[in-house]
A protein has these predicted regions:
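Extreme N-terminal leader/targeting segments of oxidoreductases
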Residues: 1-18, 36-37
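N-terminal Rossmann-like FAD-binding beta1-loop-alpha1 element of flavoenzymes
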Residues: 16-43
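Residue-level detector of alpha-helix initiation sites
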Residues: 24-25, 218, 375
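Glycine-rich loop(s) and the adjacent beta-strand/alpha-helix scaffold that form part
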Residues: 36, 49-50, 184, 195-269
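Redox-cofactor-proximal catalytic regions of oxidoreductases
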Residues: 60-133, 348-352, 356-360
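Conserved redox-cofactor binding core of oxidoreductases
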Residues: 102-191, 406
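A glycine-rich dinucleotide-binding beta-alpha-beta segment and adjacent secondary-structure elements
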Residues: 176-187, 333-344, 364-407
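FAD cofactor-binding and catalytic pocket of flavoenzymes
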Residues: 239-365
Length: 407
């Protein structure tokens, strides 16, 4: 059932099996699974059923370091969470994603790919992947270079619209809207209950056997740090690096590409539509170059922009540009913008901390995101681009023009 703390229509006095903070993809998925196991669940969603300024305002924060999005732009604070605006790009992990001990021991996960594989089919169904088989697609694109293409599948599932009726009808799940976590009540080193508060300052104490934070990486860290502080550091071991090692998959445009030949692998673009595919270095060459994974995405820029890219090529490769213009006019070549998303090296200085000055409506310190790219980021980008450029030259596929900021 769905209740609203703002309207004072929630009067349940039971002890829930699980109380979940956050009704985004993680919180809703967990609640549905617990419901199937006959558990009584309460989801406390800090926002409303739809977007509201009063809720979204609580997501404002401070960014220090490299330029980044405003923190209230990248996140949405209402039912469905980030699924209300995500693109739904999905792909499976590789075995190597869980173990890059060749770079450092801190890049070895405590779990392996085989530990999550049994949950793939169930997960694909929950998020509505239309063609999950695409995610296993990997194709070598050269016998001489360790390059492969991979595909993404696009769910784009909005957990608000997909599951709201399920939540309304559920007998085991209670969803409480406009319910902001105010304080965890700790007794004998265990969370016994919590105080929640609405925007009109209605309050409620909730008891549960277990509590789950599913508010997203930034908000989880913010609340854990704050709850630890107001509970005299009795919530968790102070040695646990809460808020530390914050990471992003940075997305940047790296340059322009002209192709003399069509690629021989499937997830590529046509002039009429984009089939977004990624090219990445295989793991053997990543290890050899001592870099992390970096996916290159080629985007068809449209006819006019493609001509401009080729025209720019004439400035530094006039002989090649004439050949390419001839192919372009015969519809035999492609131009593209090259974008990348790469994996970052964990850094303890990239973290979430609490502001000493700015607070939200409920007097909770706003988060500070401290984030900077480092020399390893640049090493990963440059090594990937250099290797891809060598492939283009030696296979006589085309030319890559790198943007100035890379160098």
């Amino acid at each position: 059932m769905i209740f609203d703390l703002e309207k004072n229509n929630f009067s349940e006095e039971i002890i829930y099996d699980v109380c979940i903070f956050g009704a985004g993809p993680a919180g809703i998925s967990l609640a549905l699974k617990l419901q199937d196991n006959n558990k009584r669940v309460l989801i406390c969603e800090a926002g409303d059923e739809n977007y509201s300024e009063q809720s979204q305002n609580c997501y404002k924060g401070i960014v220090k370091g490299d330029e980044y999005f405003d923190l209230d732009v990248t996140r949405l604070r209402y039912l469905g969470g980030s699924s209300n605006h995500w693109g739904g790009w999905c792909r499976t992990f590789n075995k190597m994603d869980f173990n890059r001990g060749d770079i450092g021991e801190y890049l070895i996960w405590p779990i392996e790919k085989k530990d999550i594989d049994p949950f793939f089919d169930e997960t694909a169904k929950i998020i509505g992947l239309p063609k999950p088989e695409r995610l296993n697609y990997r194709e070598s694109i050269s016998s001489n270079f360790s390059l492969e293409s991979i595909e993404f599948d696009y769910a784009g599932t909005n957990f608000n619209t997909k599951y709201i009726n399920v939540l309304k009808k559920s007998k085991n799940i209670d969803l409480l809207l406009n319910a902001n976590l105010k304080k965890l009540i700790i007794e004998n080193n265990k969370i016994k209950s919590c105080d929640i508060i609405s925007y009109n300052f209605s309050t409620k104490n909730i008891s549960a056997k277990n509590f789950v934070f599913a508010m997203g990486g930034i908000e989880n860290s913010r609340q854990l740090l704050w709850q630890q502080k107001i509970n005299n550091e009795n919530l968790y071991d102070t040695q646990i690096p809460v808020g530390k090692y914050w990471m992003e998959h940075p997305h940047y445009t790296l340059g322009n590409l002209v192709l003399k030949k069509k690629f021989i692998f499937s997830p590529m673009f046509e002039r009429s539509k984009i089939e977004v595919g990624f090219i990445q270095l295989k793991h053997d060459i990543q290890k050899k170059l001592n870099i992390l994974s970096c996916g290159l995405r080629l985007e068809w820029p449209g006819y006019t922009n493609a001509k401009q890219i080729i025209a720019d090529l004439a400035c530094y490769a006039p002989n090649l540009s004439k050949e390419i213009f001839d192919l372009f006019n015969q519809n035999l070549m492609c131009a593209a913008r090259v974008r990348a998303a790469w994996e970052q090296l964990p850094s303890v200085t990239n973290n979430i901390t609490l502001s000493l000055k700015e607070r939200d409506k409920f007097n909770i310190p706003r988060p500070i995101l401290n984030w900077k790219k480092n020399s390893f980021d640049k090493k990963t980008i440059k090594a990937t681009l250099d290797y891809f450029s060598q492939f283009l030259l030696k296979e006589d596929m085309g030319r890559l023009q790198v943007d100035d900021w890379i160098n």
